[in-house]
Amino acid sequence: AGLVDYDSPVPICADEACHTVVDLPELVGKYQMINIKLDKTGGLTEALFLARAAETIGMKIMVGCMVATSLAMAPAILLGHMAEFLDLDGPLLLKDDRPDGLKFENGLIHPPTPALWG
């Protein structure tokens, strides 16, 4: 209740409060942005529904991740064009990523190659 209509100088992002489209109505007026993580939404399909619904109500989108390999991160790249922020650094936090993993260079994530999928 403390966030209702709070006038923040920076957008407040709902992370663990937002898992699926069902959560959005409760966030309106409290948050200006949501963090979409495919691990939370249950996969790419629900993440796409959530992103579209958030756009419809004027919420900004961040695409984030848990610590995971490039194989888990690659589908999230498909949401990148809808997001104001991307935080897909999960593979960088691992000692060893998958062979043929995503390439990170100069702040950019390169799209996956067919070899990533096995």
Language model feature labels by segment:
Residues M66-G118:
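Flexible C-terminal active-site loop/helix
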Residues G2-L3, D7-D89:
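Catalytic alpha/beta core domains of metabolic enzymes, predominantly
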